[in-house]
From Swiss-Prot:
UniProt-listed CDD domains: alpha_CARP_X_XI_like
One Pfam family here: Carb_anhydrase
Localisation per UniProt entry: Secreted
Source organism per UniProt: Homo sapiens
Family: Belongs to the alpha-carbonic anhydrase family.
GO terms for MF: hydro-lyase activity; zinc ion binding
Gene: CA11
Residues in Alpha-carbonic anhydrase domain copies: 33-303
Protein name: Carbonic anhydrase-related protein 11
Function description: Does not have a catalytic activity.
Glycan attachment points: 118, 170, 260
Keyword Nucleotidyltransferase: no
Signal sequence extent: 1-23
Gene3D superfamilies: Alpha carbonic anhydrase (3.10.200.10)
InterPro entries: Alpha_CARP_X/XI, CA_dom, CA_dom_sf, Carbonic_anhydrase_a-class
Length: 328
């Protein structure tokens, strides 16, 4: 059955009417960039998540895919895998630098070509190169992450998006092939303290430079390892990109210990606009795709569920940075 056939009659009528109206209002939208998290932007129809797989044939997996993301992780379904090695981060001993963007959909950090930052270990069979750091957050606390744990959301989610540099030459090619992508997700709560890496991104001097869509600000001397908790476990599953084209070539790795940012930092994020300054303000918050069915996919974790109260200790529960366990 085709994707369009899966629509209810009312939704189909809304879609076709909106497409007809869009054809008569201004220039035609770029089909590769015509999507949003909300169906209506400034009175104009822009395809939201229910329509992603219907407006572009290349995005059909968004509607008919069977391994879509994000998902709700029920901890009782997580299979303990004692053979999962620790995660490894390679920076060549250099500090990270790059550009922080307001894309109109996300807060996005794009690393400079050098140094090359790679992640390996855990469930990954190959080394994956960092392509983007993406921050998603909600309009209210506790409801901003894409993934959930036991039906519980978080205020924000940081996604480190990587491509398999051993099999593919770039992100685009990797997104179309098996074992192509790896995304590390870290959940974020609002608290009285703040993660040191996120503090660099969210301090007043930085965040006010990206108030509007297409604003950008260059950052340097960043220590990516400071983004990670001192010790943590992880849960992994096979899924997809959570934005069009929803390619099902992603190994997701969810860090099981949340980070913190302050309420002031979260408020600053919610003041970012998804529009340029010439248009009406619309908060960048709420930039997440709805949950997708997990179905029969396996969830694996490196922490023994028989000992949930025991803190994870030892080198297997630390990020290894350039070959050395990070933290005390």
């Amino acid at each position: 059955m085709g994707a369009a056939a899966r629509l209810s009659a009312p939704r189909a009528l809304v879609l076709w009417a909106a497409l007809g109206a869009a054809a008569h209002i201004g220039p035609a939208p770029d089909p590769e960039d015509w999507w949003s998290y909300k169906d209506n932007l400034q009175g104009n129809f822009v395809p939201g998540p229910p329509f992603w797989g219907l407006v572009n044939a290349a995005w059909s997996l968004c509607a008919v895919g069977k391994r879509q993301s994000p998902v709700d992780v029920e901890l009782k379904r997580v299979l303990y895998d004692p053979f999962l090695p620790p995660l490894r981060l390679s920076t060549g001993g250099e500090k990270l630098r790059g550009t922080l963007y307001n894309t109109g959909r996300h807060v996005s950090f794009l690393p400079a070509p050098r140094p090359v930052v790679n992640v390996s270990g855990g469930p990954l069979l190959y080394s994956h190169r960092l392509s983007e750091l993406r921050l998603l957050f909600g309009a209210r606390d506790g409801a901003g992450s894409e993934h959930q744990i036991n039906h519980q959301g978080f205020s924000a989610e940081v996604q480190l998006i990587h491509f398999n540099q051993e099999l593919y030459g770039n992100f685009s090619a990797a997104s179309r092939g098996p074992n192509g992508l790896a995304i590390l997700s870290l959940f974020v709560n609002v608290a009285s303290t703040s993660n040191p890496f996120l503090s660099r991104l969210l301090n007043r001097d930085t965040i006010t430079r990206i108030s509007y869509k297409n604003d950008a600000y260059f950052l340097q001397d960043l220590s990516l390892e400071l983004l990670f908790p001192e010790s943590f476990g992880f849960i992994t599953y096979q899924g997809s990109l959570s934005t069009p084209p929803c390619s099902e070539t992603v190994t997701w790795i969810l860090i099981d210990r949340a980070l913190n940012i302050t309420s002031l930092q979260m408020h600053s994020l919610r003041l970012l606009s998804q529009n340029p300054p010439s248009q009406i303000f619309q908060s960048l918050s709420g930039n997440s795709r709805p949950l997708q069915p997990l179905a029969h996919r396996a969830l694996r974790g490196n922490r023994d569920p028989r000992h949930p109260e025991r803190r994870c200790r030892g080198p297997n529960y630390r990020l290894h940075v350039d070959g050395v366990p990070h933290g005390r």
